[in-house]
Amino acid sequence: PSAGTVEVFGKPLTGINRRAGYLFQGDALLPWRNARENVAAGLIFHGRPRATARAEADEWLGRVGLGAAAERYPHQLSGGMKKRVALAQMLALKPEILLMDEPFSALDVQTRSLMENELLALWSAKRRAVVFITHDLEEAIALGDRVVVMSAGPASRPVGEFVIDLPRPRDVAEIRMTPAFVDLHREIWQLLKGEVQKAYAAGAEART
């Protein structure tokens, strides 16, 4: 859309959405700051005293399993550890909405599974609203309460919405093996497959 309005919790959004936290695919950590200082940076920007911000940063690093890595710099961290620092950085600000754009897509399969379970555990503790963008249908089903399928671009739009009535708490590896998961995957894939084929066809036409 090129016109219209956006409301967040019933109020018009006219600038930066300060009630939302963001986690993207790319690495956004500051290379000259250690893990503690990266997490504390946003808190300091929002007015926390430096000592308080560092203490809160240590608390959040502990929650994501990196309490012992607080003084390590990004180049000393693995891909999964960097993502956990970024997750702590976002959650430390206590956003009411989490906007996550393919945050785990660059990770290996094992690390990705660990990070997905980490996200589920942290979500269970606070129950924030999460908008999670992914190209991985299995990931969408394993994590979500609803899956919205978008049409092939460039003028992408919602073409289907599915309720994910799988029980919580979940383990992303174990839930994939349940009959209910398989049934949901089959149902959603019937719609998604058509959009994937349209995208491939459009790409083939552009190359000829």
Segments predicted by a language model, with ranges:
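Conserved ABC ATPase "signature" region
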Residues: 40, 44, 51-69, 121
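Conserved signature/switch motifs of ABC ATPase nucleotide-binding domains
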Residues: 72-75, 93
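Hydrophobic anchor residue at the start of the ABC signature
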Residues: 87
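Conserved ABC transporter NBD signature motif
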Residues: 3-15
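Short coil-to-helix segment of the ABC ATPase nucleotide-binding domain corresponding to the Q-loop/switch region
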Residues: 33-41
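Catalytic Walker B motif of ABC-type/P-loop ATPase nucleotide-binding domains
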Residues: 98-101
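Signature (C-motif/LSGGQ) region and adjacent switch/coupling loops
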Residues: 16, 36, 62, 70-73
